[in-house]
């Protein structure tokens, strides 16, 4: 008997044709066939779920509305003069007006779900096209890629040595911010992620009918679960909730994406210039920052305790990741001294740990004496556990450099005993993680408005010994005291920037320095790079109105010539960070005026920095949407005034776009690249 079982929506009748679509050149129409198939199939699944969950009537209402609106769109596309013809739109409005509240909610939810699924399909297609571009070496590389950039440099006559020297000057720091209207729940985001994983699985060829059916069933189950799930939070997220939402992207994608960035750099140099770079000698090209838990400007819910919570949660996350990685290393590094050698340095430190640290659980048993790496990693695991539970515990690592030192011993021992491949595959990526994230994961910026500092100085008097009468001033002083204490409790690099919103004069910067010193905050840096003991606390003026942008160069000239400020500049290695506000300048002067004034301010700040021997690092406070100063980050970097880029740049990554940029490792890697 013939089976009535329907054919899987994604079934590949011709595997070769499917492969041709997936690898099509960027100028071939077939490249979009997989996207169309995904959108069509996801829409069909949503329709099935809609009938099952809400009935045929709701499905027909959605379909009728969809048909009318598509017909209206196509009519206008063919005949623009008919855009004013209301016939089709009136029919759609009539259908909506007849709905009761329950039906309207279900129809709205159906359209929202459709657009969510379409977005997932488009995101998967971006990943698909990125893979295809890597296969297609005959066509020009994607704009913004390492390979494309190096090719342009080579064609411009820049040598491999000069290109490598330029690379060593670069540091990019995405700074995550909270999204005040973020209502999407993590459970919903994770369901979307699982659907995306199934879409990616459907691109793996050969795709059997059974595999296609299994993926389809998984997607159908997730869509059903999505339909039965509350889409948004029923209560406003707390500051701690916002902190957790920002941290989840490290676990979802950034820990995986980071080593791939450096591998892509090395491969691109090898392919374009024929130059073999040692990945271990590359500088840290990427660091991360956050405002979540430290942004007090206009947010009364961000208390000094929130700063402590943000640092604690970030530290706990990165230490948990290191524990997982060391455990994974222990599984893999089973090299025995009966088969290969181990360095004397590693054996000596292992002996020291065995003599001085008690109560260590040896993962592979106390009698396993020949597998020295595993024994050593057991002690490293124990020391990390102690660090996570209490930074002051006797057996804890005092800082990330001690942990890195142990990893370097393992790395060196492997390389000197015919284990170079093991070191490259298993240890190098963890070393890069430690050099990037330390024990603090990211720097937490503190932000407050200039008028709050001015009001506090007025209350406290010239000697800063008056009583803080207002709650606002009391909280401000508590914040500075918390900064002083937390920079001693946590890695000092956890807090190193203080953003001054609404900055208009050099006095706004000097006010922060006075308040910080009065609270015993170490403002001056004790070293000039990330390996120093304490980088201090650099005040960062944020120029965000049109008038303040026009005055920015003059303000910084006066600040840099101030005798009180000169020693601080020296302590920071002559670096100065200045922030430019895109969103507020857009609101103040409009998009065109804002863009032009930002350009001029950047150019003037650069000229002023050259005059005073200052190394300028700009912090671009860009919104997520175009209306808030958002847009393609790569294009924004290219649009900077010629000759005005120091190699270091910080850019806000707004909460409303974090999910679309960093929820997936492939997209996170591409965004960072």
Report each predicted region and the residues it spans.
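C-terminal amphipathic alpha-helical interaction region
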Residues: 2, 6, 10, 18-26, ...
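Short glycine-rich or small-residue beta-strand-to-loop segments that form or flank ligand, phosphate
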Residues: 112, 411-413, 498-499, 539-542, ...
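Beta-sheet entry/capping signal
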Residues: 283-285, 289-291, 299, 431-432, ...
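Expand to "…catalyze enediolate/carbanion chemistry for C-C bond making/breaking, isomerization
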Residues: 293-296, 476, 480-481, 598, ...
């Amino acid at each position: 008997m013939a089976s009535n079982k329907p054919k899987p929506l994604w079934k590949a009748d011709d595997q070769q044709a499917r492969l041709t679509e997936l690898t099509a050149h960027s100028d071939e129409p077939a490249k979009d066939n997989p996207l169309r198939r995904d959108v069509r199939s996801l829409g069909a699944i949503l329709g099935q779920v809609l009938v099952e969950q809400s009935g045929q009537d709701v499905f027909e209402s959605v379909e009728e509305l969809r048909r009318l609106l598509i017909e209206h769109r196509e009519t206008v596309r063919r005949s623009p003069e008919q855009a004013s013809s209301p016939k089709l739109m009136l029919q759609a409005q009539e259908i909506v007006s007849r709905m009761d509240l329950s039906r309207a909610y279900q129809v709205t939810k159906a359209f929202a779900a459709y657009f969510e699924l379409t977005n997932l399909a488009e995101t998967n297609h971006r990943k698909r096209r990125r893979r295809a571009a890597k296969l297609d070496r005959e066509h020009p590389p994607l704009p913004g890629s390492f390979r494309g950039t190096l090719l342009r440099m080579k064609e411009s006559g820049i040598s491999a040595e000069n290109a490598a020297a330029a690379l060593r000057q670069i540091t990019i720091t995405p700074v995550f911010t909270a999204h005040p209207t973020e209502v999407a729940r993590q459970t919903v985001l994770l369901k979307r992620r699982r659907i995306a994983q199934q879409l990616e699985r459907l691109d793996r060829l050969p795709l059997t009918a059974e595999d296609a059916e299994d993926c389809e069933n998984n997607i159908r189950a997730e869509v059903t679960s999505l339909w039965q799930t509350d889409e948004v939070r029923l209560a406003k997220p707390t500051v701690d909730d916002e902190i957790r939402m920002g941290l989840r992207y490290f676990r979802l994608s950034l820990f995986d994406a980071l080593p791939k960035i450096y591998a892509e750099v090395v491969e691109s140099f090898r392919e374009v210039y024929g130059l073999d770079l040692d990945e271990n000698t590359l500088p840290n090209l990427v660091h991360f920052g956050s405002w979540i838990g430290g942004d007090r400007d206009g947010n009364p819910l961000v208390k000094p305790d929130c700063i402590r919570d943000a640092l604690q949660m970030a530290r706990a996350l990165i230490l948990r990741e290191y524990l997982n990685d060391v455990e994974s290393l222990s599984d893999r590094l089973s090299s025995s001294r009966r088969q290969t050698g181990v360095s004397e340095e590693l054996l000596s430190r292992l002996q020291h740990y065995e003599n001085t640290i008690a109560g260590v659980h040896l993962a592979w048993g106390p009698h396993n004496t020949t597998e020295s790496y595993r024994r050593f990693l057991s002690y490293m695991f124990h020391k990390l556990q102690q660090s996570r539970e209490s930074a002051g515990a006797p057996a804890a690592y005092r800082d990330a450099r001690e942990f890195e030192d142990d990893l370097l011993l393992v790395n060196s021992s492997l390389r000197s005993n015919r284990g170079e491949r093991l070191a490259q595959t298993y240890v190098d990526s963890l070393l890069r993680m430690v050099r990037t994230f330390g024990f603090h994961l990211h720097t937490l910026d503190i932000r407050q408005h200039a008028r709050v500092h001015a009001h506090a100085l007025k209350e406290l008097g010239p000697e800063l010994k008056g009583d803080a009468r207002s709650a606002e001033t009391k909280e401000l002083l508590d914040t500075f005291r918390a900064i002083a204490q937390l920079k001693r409790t946590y890695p000092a690099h956890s807090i190193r920037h203080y953003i001054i919103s609404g900055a208009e004069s050099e006095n706004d910067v000097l006010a922060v320095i006075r308040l910080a010193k009065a609270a015993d905050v170490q403002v001056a840096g004790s070293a000039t790079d990330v390996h120093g003991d304490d980088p201090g606390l650099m005040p960062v003026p944020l120029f965000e109105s049109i008038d303040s942008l026009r005055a920015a160069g003059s303000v910084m000239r006066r600040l840099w010539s101030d005798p009180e400020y000169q020693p601080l500049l020296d302590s920071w290695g002559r670096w100065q960070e200045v922030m430019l506000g895109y969103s507020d300048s857009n609101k103040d002067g409009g998009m065109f005026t804002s863009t032009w004034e930002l350009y001029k301010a950047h150019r003037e700040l650069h000229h002023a920095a050259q005059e005073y021997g200052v190394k300028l690092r700009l912090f671009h406070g860009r919104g997520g949407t175009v209306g808030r100063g958002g847009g393609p980050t790569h294009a924004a970097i290219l649009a900077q005034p010629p000759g005005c880029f120091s190699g270091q740049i910080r850019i806000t990554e707004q909460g409303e776009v974090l999910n679309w940029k960093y929820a997936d490792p492939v997209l996170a890697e591409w965004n960072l690249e």
